[in-house]
Structure formats: structure tokens, C-alpha cells
Regions:
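Arg/Lys-rich, positively charged N-terminal/basic patches that mediate binding to nucleic acids
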Residues: 1-36
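Structural signal for well-ordered, non-membrane alpha-helices
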Residues: 18, 38-45
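Residues at alpha-helix boundaries and the short loops/turns that link adjacent helices
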Residues: 24-28, 44, 92
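Juxtamembrane/interface motifs at transmembrane-helix termini
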Residues: 32-34, 50-54, 105-106
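Enriched for short, Lys/Arg-rich terminal
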Residues: 72-112
Length: 112
């Protein structure tokens, strides 16, 4: 089994998700949802290739992989015997821009 290590940004992301959920839905729902995210992340220690590579899905040169965990994308990379959790981002956010500084193409670009 591989060791899982969280980046400071990933820990901050989880705290922000907790804060949002707590304000919107209360403690019970928050605890249940965070446990689901952590459970999915833990599966990576046994199945590190479970996630999809960003390069596979978006054709972007990146070593990051991701999994979907309870309405969030968990971005990680494999470093020797370590799974490094890079970010945990709400699926509705512009994660490519946040993670890699890449703006997705828009329909406006097609009109030019």
C-alpha cells in the first residue's frame, strides 16, 4: 500500500469544503460528506492508478491524475511510493484554471 500525503493546499481545500457544508447543511451532513471524500482518497493507497490522467481526458501535458469524490475532484500525483494529494476542488469550479492556469475554450472563441 502506498502512503497518502496531503499538500497544504489540499488541506486548505478540505477545510473550505467543511466550512461551506457546515454553513449550508449543518454538522451531520458535513461529517458524512467529508468522510465520503476521505474514504475515496484512501482507496488510492491500494489502487493508485484508479484515477484518470489529466492528459488522457483533456490532452494536457500534466502528471496529475484525478478521481471524483462526492461532488469534488481530487487531484493527485504518484511520487515513488507516495500518493500526493494536490488539490480537492468542487466539481463546479474551473479546476483546470485553478490547478494549471489553463482557461478552457469558450464559444466566443469560435465566433472569431
Amino acid at each position: 500500500m502506498m502512503k497518502i500525503v496531503f499538500s497544504p493546499e489540499a488541506l486548505k481545500d478540505i477545510e473550505e469544503i467543511k466550512s461551506y457544508l457546515l454553513g449550508q447543511f449543518g454538522e451531520e451532513t458535513t461529517t458524512k460528506n467529508i468522510k465520503k471524500v476521505i474514504k475515496e482518497i484512501r482507496t488510492l493507497s491500494s489502487f493508485p492508478l484508479k484515477g484518470t490522467g489529466i492528459w488522457e481526458r483533456y490532452g494536457i501535458d500534466s502528471e496529475y491524475r484525478y478521481i471524483y469524490a462526492n461532488k469534488n475532484y481530487v487531484f493527485y500525483r504518484i511520487e515513488d511510493n507516495v500518493i500526493r494529494i494536490i488539490r480537492v476542488l468542487d466539481a463546479r469550479r474551473d479546476f483546470l484554471n485553478i490547478l494549471l492556469g489553463i482557461k478552457p475554450p469558450t464559444d466566443d472563441n469560435d465566433k472569431e
